[in-house]
C-alpha cells in the first residue's frame, strides 16, 4: 500500500494536483477531475492513451489546464489518439492528423502539410474547415 500511495501522489504531482490529494471528487473542478482521470489512466502505464473530447464538458477557463497536461504527455513521447475540436491544439502537438467526415477518413497527414497552403492544394477544403489559411 505505501508503494501505491507513493505512485498515486507522484501521478497527481505530474498532472499538477498534488496539493489536492486529500480532496474528494465533488470538491474538484471539472478540469481537475479530468486531470485525475488522466493520472488514473497513467497508473496503468499504457502504451497508448485515448482521449475522446477531453475538454468538451469543461468550462472555457478550465480547458487550458487539461490541454497543458496532454501537451506534457506529448512532449514525453506518449502515443495518444485524441478526438477533439481543438484544432489549433491538435495541430500543435500531433505527428499525424486524421480527419474524418461521416465516419470516413478524409485525410491522414502530417500537421505541417495542413499548415502549408503550398503543399497539397487538394487539402484546401480541410484547411478551411480547420480554420487554417
Task: Give each language-model segment a name.
Residues 90-92:
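A short, surface-exposed alpha-helical micro-motif characterized by mixed small hydrophobic
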Residues 60-62:
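Helix N-cap at the start of a conserved alpha-helix in ABC-type nucleotide-binding domains
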Residues 64-76:
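Helical segment within the ABC ATPase nucleotide-binding domain
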Residues 49-52:
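Catalytic Walker B motif of ABC-type/P-loop ATPase nucleotide-binding domains
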Residues 104-127:
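Conserved beta-strand-loop-alpha-helix hinge in the C-terminal portion
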Residues 23-26, 44:
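Conserved signature/switch motifs of ABC ATPase nucleotide-binding domains
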Residues 84-85:
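H-loop/switch region of ABC-family ATPase nucleotide-binding domains
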